[in-house]
Amino acid sequence: MRQATELDQSIHCASAANLDLVQFAAELCELLVEENFGELFGRIFATLSRYDRLNLPRLKAYSELPNRQLLPALAAMIQQHLVYHYTSYDDGVTYYEANMQSAYYLVRSGKILEFVEERLGKYAATVLSTIMNLGHAQVSYLETLPELTSEAVKANGVSEEHGEHEEGEEQSNGLNGEHSNEQPELLHPTLKALAAHGYIIRVREAQFQSHADNILDAERVIRSKPEMKALKGKRLEEAVIEGTLGLLKERTDGDLTRGLIVHGVPRGAKRKYSSRRADEPNKKPRTDFASVDEIDEQDEEEENEWLDDEMGYDTTPMESGLVVRVNYNKLDVALRNRRFIELAEQGVSPETAEVYECLLRRIEYQTHQCRDTAEIPREGEEGEQYSVPIALSALAEDVDPRLDLSSSTGPMDTSQPDGRRGKRPLESDVDGTNHEGANGLSSGGNRTFEIDQHLSLLAQPPHNLTSKRMVSGLITWTVEFRHLARKLRHLELERMIEARYGDVALRVVRVLHAKGKLDEKRLQEISLLPFKDLRQVLASMQAGGFVDLQEVPRDAQRQPSRTIYLWYYDPDRICNSVLQDTYKAMSRCLQRLRFERSRIKDFLEKTERSDVKGNEQRFLSEPELVLLEQWRAKEALLLGEVARLDEMVAVMRDY
């Protein structure tokens, strides 16, 4: 039954991939395509989004484009994954369909590159940006691109910025001017780092077809197998569903992390604390120098094993014929984890938030996408989905040993209370109860206990950011993804309601969400508000679409005096309404940006000239400099608003 539900949801994935709200979402995607690729691409994409699925003659007729323009543009749009294509087995006709999801990710590309640069370094972000601009690319082609080589030259051994490389690579990328041989040495480890984190995947043929076409094609193949002809009825349907899901997974699987993950962590991935500056002082002083030397030797051996063997000197190149593309599903997981960390930072100490970040990063390495289904289930119908369990001992290895965990929580309970009543207890270093190691760091067992205490703080209401489980007698921690995704949606809606209608409306909404449908009298008793204020708030929120009123007649006469009026709060309907408004607002921002650009088109063309760009003070007059500053401020304002609205779309739809 579960497999049948998964297949049914997969078949309807195509409609969900069209962003649910077709009108404003399609308008937004058309603007994004035209903004990034020009008017020709925008015209073809608008035609496909308006008429949904077209063969080549109809697409040519509706778009009114000649073959010399249409065919090369279609090939380029398929390269950019903006258009699906599928050749029917019945009549041999090829049909084209707009890929709304890929078009929408154009608005999130800057945020993704910023995240990758923060995580893996500037050169990794450059490589990912190149792949993103090409749609997909062959490894051998990436080796020939001058921008990747020039980036290595500019960075002068980019290991200072690149989070995956150490001093050894700085020497190999030195100043001898022979950069042509060093570029592949840097490119291949960077590609391996991106693949190990899941940020790039292998391109498969099924990825050029819509999900619905892949489902129908896989089902046709499964039904045509000889062993299926002997089955009938329910057994046949179950076998078809199981075979279809398996074949679909096999055809669409582009995972490149196999062999690049060691003990649940990407090979060569530096622990968060290892990227700190070498001259940064420790939290606590070291005391026993003999023990310090031994510990330093062990740390050096571990770091060499972690970095050099697994990443820094892994000179095995990637397969030259491998074609890769950006894995947006995995990047959504990483961006969602960043939102969870921001949520945690609002109520816990920085030390606890850093422990939570280590947990989420471990989970991210083993999580391929935010949801198993395309559509978000309705409130109350969504089952809980826990992450993979992460052992507490593994987290103890990732948390910075210099991070002071003991002072950010309450005092530890002692197993044996002090028997000297009325006397001041001895200092910890006098009575022998000091739990620190020789170098001022907590001992292993005590450190693990402190991490467990911090995770226990995160598991407390109201957010319940973590969950504790016992697996084979070992303490593990997980994250309840669907619960936290709902929490993010609710917090976003509550923030909007409070900003529009005030804190009184927020109290009413929280009561309705917790209690369900209530009549006005019962709602007034629970919310402790005067009837006059309550009615004003309910009327304003009903006009804004945030609460609804249901009429329940007591008899068949349906008289107003014999009718019960129940107020209720439907977060699912409100989320859809907010998404529609958000798409519309993003479209208006892009349209306004285009209009403002057209007003000063000649001036902007002048500023984009190669001789003027970077030398504005020399070639532009004082009024032109003022106009340029005003334009940049206006552009930053509009694009910043689009990015902020994209955060809301991610919370409401993707996470």
Swiss-Prot record:
The entry's keywords: DNA-directed RNA polymerase, Nucleus, Transcription, Zinc
Subcellular location: Nucleus
Organism of derivation: Neosartorya fischeri (strain ATCC 1020 / DSM 3700 / CBS 544.65 / FGSC A1164 / JCM 1740 / NRRL 181 / WB 181) (Aspergillus fischerianus)
Record's compositionally biased regions (Basic and acidic residues): 276-287, 418-427
Function noted in UniProt: DNA-dependent RNA polymerase catalyzes the transcription of DNA into RNA using the four ribonucleoside triphosphates as substrates. Specific core component of RNA polymerase III which synthesizes small RNAs, such as 5S rRNA and tRNAs.
Disordered: annotated segments: 153-183, 270-305, 402-445
Chain positions covered by the region annotation Leucine-zipper: 582-603
GO cellular component, one term: RNA polymerase III complex
GO BP term (any one): DNA-templated transcription
PANTHER family reported for this sequence: DNA-DIRECTED RNA POLYMERASE III SUBUNIT RPC3, RNA POLYMERASE III DNA DIRECTED -RELATED
InterPro entries named in the record: POLR3C_WHD, RNA_pol_III_RPC82-rel_HTH, RNA_pol_III_Rpc82_C, RPC3, WH-like_DNA-bd_sf, WH_DNA-bd_sf
Transferase is among the record's keywords: no
Biased composition (Polar residues): 405-417
Subunit structure: Component of the RNA polymerase III (Pol III) complex consisting of 17 subunits.
Protein name: DNA-directed RNA polymerase III subunit rpc3
Biased composition (Acidic residues): 291-305
Family assignment from sequence similarity: Belongs to the RNA polymerase beta chain family.
